Every structure is written in C-alpha cells, then in structure tokens.
C-alpha cells in the first residue's frame, strides 16, 4: 500500500468540504477523483500530498518523502525555455536527474518527445500540463 486515508474531514470555518473520506492507494494503480466544482477534490489532493492537514481523520503514507506528487490547476513553466530546458531546470532545482536521456524519457512518457526542443511558450495548455506532469515523474514516484 502507498497511501491510506481514514475518516478524512476538512472544515473551512463552518463549511465542511470533506466528510468521512476513506480509501487506500496501492502501487501501480491509478486513482481517479471525480466531482463537481467545489466538491473538495483539490483539498483532498493537497491533504494526500501533505500540503494541507485534515480537520479530522488520518493519512498514512508508506513511501519516502517526495514519493507523492501534486500537480495543481495553475502551474508554471518558463515560456522562453525548451521543454528539455524546463525539465532540466526544475529537476536540478529539486536534486533530481538532469541528464538528457532521463529528461527525454520523461517527455516520452507524457507524449512530448517530438517537442523536446520547442519553446514551452508555444505549447497548448494541455501540453504545458503534460510538461509539468513530466516534472513530477522525474521525482521517481513509487
């Protein structure tokens, strides 16, 4: 098991955005959170990644620090840098691999390999999100 949530609840003032959320995430699985705007998906993801604390309940992480990644709605890329240069910058800043082979593999995993030398400022919003996902993949999640 990678992550276990038990009885998670989150209050913002008197407003409950999460109530009694419990589930487990296992290595090699894909977990999808679906809900309406304001349902608490982002709050739950932040709690799972350790970026926020639940009001009640427990979160158990069975991975090393950095084993979970979080990609929010709005992320930043340097528009004047290529996809490879963006990955090298962010990866190096966090002490992760910066060799071209590793960075190219991350781009391939998010189907951006053909755009490795393209300036990120020319990317569509979806491509920019995939570039940010490649950044998270370089953190070597379990």
Task: Describe the residue ranges of each PLM region.
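The feature captures the beta-strand-to-loop junction immediately N-terminal to the Walker
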Residues: 34-36
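Hydrophobic anchor residue at the start of the ABC signature
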Residues: 133
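Helix-to-loop junction immediately C-terminal to a conserved catalytic motif
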Residues: 49
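Conserved ABC ATPase "signature" region
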Residues: 88, 92, 98-115
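Conserved structural motif at the start of ABC-family nucleotide-binding domains
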Residues: 3, 18-20
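Conserved ABC transporter NBD signature motif
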Residues: 53-67
């Amino acid at each position: 098991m990678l992550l276990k949530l038990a009885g998670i609840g989150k209050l913002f003032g008197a407003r409950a955005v999460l109530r009694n959320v419990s589930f487990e995430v296992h290595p090699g699985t894909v977990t999808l959170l679906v809900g309406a705007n304001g349902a608490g998906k982002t709050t739950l993801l932040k709690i799972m990644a350790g970026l926020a604390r639940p009001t009640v309940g427990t979160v158990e992480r069975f991975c090393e620090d950095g084993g979970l990644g979080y990609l929010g709605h709005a992320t930043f890329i340097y528009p004047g840098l290529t996809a490879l240069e963006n990955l090298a910058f962010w990866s190096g800043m966090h002490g992760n691999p910066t060799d071209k082979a590793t960075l190219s593999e991350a781009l391939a995993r998010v189907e951006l390999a053909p755009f490795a030398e393209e300036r990120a400022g020319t990317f569509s919003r979806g491509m920019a999100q995939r570039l940010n996902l490649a950044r998270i993949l370089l953190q070597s999640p379990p």
